[in-house]
């Protein structure tokens, strides 16, 4: 019997996986089975770390806001600022507040003084 050549579907799938893993080191970029395993592992890590990144940035923003607020007044803190913002119904999220705190501290001081009154 003559040899039957298989279709291109499996080859196309492996090529796609190889392109994804082309920047991996060693056998992880060459061998099909390890490439497939590393691709799954990379995608799992990427999915997990997207959630972690959101948490880490939120922590960073809160730390920055708290540091700038505590410089201005001794008795004022981040939690009081956020509480007063909600009481006054000012819709400023933590990312924007952190950017204001870094770039223009006087503006953040003005905001905090206004909401204290």
UniProtKB/Swiss-Prot annotation:
GO term, biological process aspect, one: ribosomal large subunit assembly
The entry's keywords: Chloroplast, Plastid, Ribonucleoprotein, Ribosomal protein, RNA-binding, rRNA-binding
Cellular compartments per GO CC: chloroplast; ribonucleoprotein complex; ribosome
Protein origin, superkingdom: Eukaryota
CDD domains xrefs: Ribosomal_L20
Stored InterPro entries: Ribosomal_bL20, RIBOSOMAL_L20_CS, Ribosomal_protein_bL20_C
Compartments, record wording: Plastid, Chloroplast
GO molecular function: rRNA binding; structural constituent of ribosome
Function: Binds directly to 23S ribosomal RNA and is necessary for the in vitro assembly process of the 50S ribosomal subunit. It is not involved in the protein synthesizing functions of that subunit.
PANTHER family with a match to the protein in the record: 39S RIBOSOMAL PROTEIN L20 (PTHR10986)
Similarity section: Belongs to the bacterial ribosomal protein bL20 family.
Name assigned to this protein: Large ribosomal subunit protein bL20c
């Amino acid at each position: 019997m003559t040899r039957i050549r298989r279709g291109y579907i499996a080859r196309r799938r492996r090529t796609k996986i190889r392109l994804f893993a082309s920047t991996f080191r060693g056998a992880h970029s060459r061998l099909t089975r390890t490439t497939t395993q590393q691709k799954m592992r990379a995608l799992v890590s990427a999915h997990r770390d997207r959630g972690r990144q959101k948490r880490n940035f939120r922590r960073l923003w809160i730390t920055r806001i708290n540091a700038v607020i505590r410089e201005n007044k001794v008795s004022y803190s981040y939690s009081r600022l956020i509480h007063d913002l909600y009481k006054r119904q000012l819709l400023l999220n933590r990312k924007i507040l952190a950017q204001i705190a870094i770039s223009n501290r006087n503006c953040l001081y003005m905001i905090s003084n206004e909401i204290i009154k």
